């Protein structure tokens, strides 16, 4: 273990609600943006506590995606700041959740998110009845976005009863932003990559199905040694998805293989960057944020070496980006969003 990361809160929750589900992206002009869900207190239950009450069951609440920008107060000042929260354009639906963001080969920001016009959530969405919307917004920046609903095309092409793009930042491959969708057909789920560029679907990957009945859930994509790697959370609330993850690799269109990785993981969205992976390193709770370096899954059983750690406290959904000579990590803690910054030289080669 080489690096230790200090952290600070950057987005506080409103009243009894939550600020959660971070997604980081750097625009071609260097602007670093953080998108997140602003959520009211849930009608019942404990929100994002370790009980499964996440987007799957509470999306009909009036969630909305907001954004902040990382800035520096003065020239030569190395102390970063985050702006006050800002709204997305009114062209997007009033209810939005789970931002997945990336930049295409033409420099356009793409933001995929889930929405609903009624009371339907992920679990009761049906292809032939009321179902989740699959919103795609794109443009030069968050102030200027065109919007379309991909639901009709995606539900038709995948046969889904419900689908949503995994939150967080994603990769660009052959000029297209690759959006990792979780697709539910009946009570079975798989992962399918949707490639978009200029607001248009370029292709859909083959379905990625877990081994021996394992159901795959939210997925982080990475480019690693010329391969597209999918690092998948296993489906299951209240710890039933803990103890392992699934890593698959391919060319962006089809999958060449996969490995089930036994690891200390509670079942949580996480972020992979090449062979580095940041996640809550615990079987029983979303805590102990740790950066590990993985062995290539195509070489056999996956092994991990810890290279950096936080303080052992709460660590929920997270995202990571490289910003100049720094690595910026944003994660959920105490119903808000926190930031940790570590010199790039201490973490990445």
Residue ranges and their predicted role:
Residues 1-349:
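Asp-box/BNR beta-propeller blade signature and adjacent active/binding-site loops
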């Amino acid at each position: 273990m080489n690096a230790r990361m200090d952290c600070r809160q950057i987005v506080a929750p409103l009243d009894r609600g939550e600020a959660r589900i971070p997604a980081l992206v750097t625009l071609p002009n260097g602007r670093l943006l953080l998108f997140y869900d602003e959520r009211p207190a849930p009608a019942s239950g404990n929100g994002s506590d370790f009980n499964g009450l996440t987007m799957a069951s509470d999306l009909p609440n009036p969630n909305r995606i907001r954004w902040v920008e990382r800035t520096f107060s003065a020239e030569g000042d190395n102390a970063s700041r985050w702006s006050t929260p800002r709204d997305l354009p009114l062209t997007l639906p009033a209810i939005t959740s789970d931002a997945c963001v990336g930049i295409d080969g033409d420099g356009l920001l793409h933001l995929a998110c889930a929405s609903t016009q009624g009371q339907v959530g992920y679990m009761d969405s049906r292809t032939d009845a009321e179902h989740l919307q699959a919103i795609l917004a794109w443009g030069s920046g968050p102030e200027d976005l065109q919007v379309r609903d991909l639901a009709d095309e995606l539900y038709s092409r995948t046969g889904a009863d419900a689908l949503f793009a995994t939150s967080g930042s994603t990769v660009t491959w052959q000029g297209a932003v690759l959006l990792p969708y979780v697709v539910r057909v009946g009570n079975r789920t798989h992962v399918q990559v949707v490639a978009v560029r200029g607001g248009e679907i370029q292709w859909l990957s083959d379905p990625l199905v877990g081994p021996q009945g394992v159901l795959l859930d939210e997925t982080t994509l990475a480019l690693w040694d010329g391969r597209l790697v999918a690092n998948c959370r296993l489906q299951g609330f209240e710890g039933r998805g803990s103890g392992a993850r699934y890593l698959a690799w391919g060319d962006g269109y089809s999958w060449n293989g996969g490995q089930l990785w036994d690891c200390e993981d509670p079942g949580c969205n996480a972020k992979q960057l090449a062979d580095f992976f940041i996640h809550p390193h615990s079987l029983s709770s979303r805590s102990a944020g740790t950066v590990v370096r993985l062995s290539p899954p195509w070489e056999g059983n996956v092994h991990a070496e810890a290279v950096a750690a936080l303080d052992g406290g709460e660590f929920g959904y997270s995202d990571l980006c490289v910003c100049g000579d720094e690595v910026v990590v944003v994660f959920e803690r105490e119903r808000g969003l926190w930031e940790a910054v570590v010199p790039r030289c201490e973490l990445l080669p």
